[in-house]
């Protein structure tokens, strides 16, 4: 069958539904899985796209594809909590091996196209990747600010950590996202959802 590799790929990436993340969903009832996170950031990218800096230089379809594939590596590498300093060590290398295997299920040129998009996202240098990264980083912040922030309070996440890992990544993408970052930070600090430091 001509599309067998595509079917093999889509069946393989179904495993993303089984990758549990640290963040809780919006009703605070359970942890989200990575497939749910991917879906949510794809929607968020579309609704925040009008606010992206220099959005005429951004290809929204490329951003959507980037967001839909960038976490597929978690099928093999697992979800690494952004504020887990030990877990973050070697993350890129683990995920690069996973990317080669997972995208390698597909034939060329799609295998290389997906791998290159994944690398572009990780490098955060192009307008598409900067916007995609901002979307990926702001979504957990939104969830934590509007819930009990269990994933952050359980880990003792500090204001300094959030500023170091999220502020530039989010704020450089949009003036409105910069404003949102400040409002979310204030909400988290007022609600004691972060350790002040």
Outline where the language-model segments fall.
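Alpha-helical, largely C-terminal catalytic domains
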Residues: 1-197
């Amino acid at each position: 069958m001509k599309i067998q590799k595509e079917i093999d790929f889509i069946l393989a990436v179904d495993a993303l539904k089984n990758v549990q993340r640290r963040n809780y969903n919006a009703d605070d009832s359970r942890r989200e899985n990575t497939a749910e996170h991917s879906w949510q950031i794809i929607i968020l990218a579309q609704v925040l796209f009008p606010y992206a800096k220099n959005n005429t230089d951004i290809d929204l379809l490329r951003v959507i594809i980037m967001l839909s594939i960038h976490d597929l590596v978690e099928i093999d590498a697992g979800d690494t909590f952004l504020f887990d300093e030990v877990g973050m060590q070697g993350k890129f290398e683990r995920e690069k091996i996973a990317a080669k295997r997972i995208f390698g299920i597909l034939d060329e040129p799609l295998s290389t196209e997906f791998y290159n998009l994944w690398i572009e996202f990780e490098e955060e240098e192009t307008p598409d990747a900067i916007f995609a990264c901002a979307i990926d980083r702001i979504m957990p912040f939104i969830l934590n600010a509007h819930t009990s922030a269990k994933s952050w309070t359980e880990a003792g996440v500090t204001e300094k950590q959030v500023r170091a890992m999220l502020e530039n990544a989010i704020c450089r993408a949009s003036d409105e996202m910069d404003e949102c970052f400040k409002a979310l930070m204030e909400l988290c600090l007022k609600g004691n959802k972060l350790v002040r430091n």
